[in-house]
């Protein structure tokens, strides 16, 4: 009986974890839409003017705006070539 309860508990945790992960992915897509400067029709500058005070340019690509201490991006940022 204890083994069955333990197994069911692990199963419930696995399902809950998957649900949380899906919600996190949806949140990242929405945040990326708000965080990038694509809608402002401005090119990314070194100072990232299009993002205001919360932005930085990444690898010469789009301007990604900071949200707290994190860079919100749908894709993992590639390392910059020097």
Swiss-Prot record:
InterPro entries for this protein: CNTX (IPR035285)
Keywords: Disulfide bond, Ion channel impairing toxin, Knottin, Neurotoxin, Secreted, Signal, Toxin, Voltage-gated sodium channel impairing toxin
Protein name in UniProt: Delta-ctenitoxin-Pn2c
Presence of the UniProt keyword Metal-binding in the record: no
GO-annotated cellular components: extracellular region
Similarity comment: Belongs to the neurotoxin 03 (Tx2) family. 06 subfamily.
Function of the protein: Reversible inhibitor of voltage-gated sodium channels (Nav). Delays the fast inactivation kinetics of neuronal-type sodium channels. In vivo, it induces rat penile erection. This effect may be due to the neuronal nitric oxide synthase (NOS1), since one of its selective inhibitor completely abolishes all the toxic effects of the toxin. This toxin also causes scratching, lacrimation, hypersalivation, sweating and agitation followed by spastic paralysis of the anterior and posterior extremities and death at dose levels of 0.24 mg/mouse.
Signal peptide boundaries: 1-17
Subcellular compartments: Secreted
Expression across tissues: Expressed by the venom gland.
Domain notes: The presence of a 'disulfide through disulfide knot' structurally defines this protein as a knottin.
């Amino acid at each position: 009986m204890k083994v069955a309860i333990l197994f069911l508990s692990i199963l419930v945790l696995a399902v809950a974890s998957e649900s949380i992960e899906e919600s996190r992915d949806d949140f990242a897509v929405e945040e990326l839409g708000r965080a990038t400067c694509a809608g402002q029709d401005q090119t990314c500058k070194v100072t990232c003017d299009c993002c205001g005070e919360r932005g930085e340019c990444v690898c010469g690509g789009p301007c990604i705006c900071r949200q707290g201490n994190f860079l919100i991006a749908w894709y993992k940022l590639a390392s910059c070539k020097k």
